[in-house]
Amino acid sequence: TRSGDIRYCEFAVTRIVYKGEDANLVSVRNITDRKQMEDELQQSLVKLENTIQNTLQAMAKIQEARDPYTTGHQLRVAALAQEIAKEMYLPEEWIRGIHVAALIHDIGKIYVPAEILSRPSKLTTSEFALVKTHPSVGYDILKTIEFPWPIADVVLQHHERLDGSGYPRGLKTGNILLEAQILAVADVVEAMSSHRPYRPAHSLDTTLEEISKNKGRLYEPDVVDSCLWLITGKGFKFN
């Protein structure tokens, strides 16, 4: 406008016959108010997503505070899982959902006593069985939260394996969400390459050999290939 205000318009062109000849009828509609409402809605969604992200990171820190040996584990897994998803050219919305799920994938460990999580010796059978409940506990914590992604199911399935040897449900190929399969590989790589109270960190070669030799048996082949290329070809490193 002459005053410098910006106005948004929508144009529609209709083919008509005018006085016996083909013509175009052009209609113009002022959609400035609608555009402003859309912009405000988008800003609100961005703020909401940032709030969700900050809340999830706070939840992760609460859980990790009980297990100092895994501090930062979920953030590092989230970073790798996100890059794997990008390497696989997944839709942006999927990538965001995978990142969110990874940030809190171990939230169910809040149910496991801290002395078990940080014990420097081998766990008993019953203690390990308790640790293995954390995907189910995480699912119960998250299932009533209305995320725009299947976060609770991804958390529930991140320890499932293609051959059915995983837990908690022993799911097999075709029944495990791709997001959970990506998270599974990222989780294994980060966990093996990090120090734990009961063992030193594995070498990078040993870690990559684990996912490579079990490609197609435990881990989804495309996910493994993308992860291997990220680390060996593109030089991905955990911060």
Description of each model-found segment:
Residues T1, V13-R15, V28, T173:
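Sensory input modules used in signal transduction
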Residues T1-G4, R161:
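PAS-family sensory domains
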Residues G4, F11-V13, I98:
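Compact sensory input modules in signal-transduction proteins
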Residues F11-N24:
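Short loop/turn elements at sensory-signaling interfaces that couple input to output
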Residues N24-S27, L103:
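Conserved Rossmann-like nucleotide-binding pocket used by diverse enzymes
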Residues R29-Q43:
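PAS-associated C-terminal cap
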Residues E40, V46, Q53, Q57-N239:
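Metal-dependent catalytic cores of enzymes that make or break cyclic nucleotides
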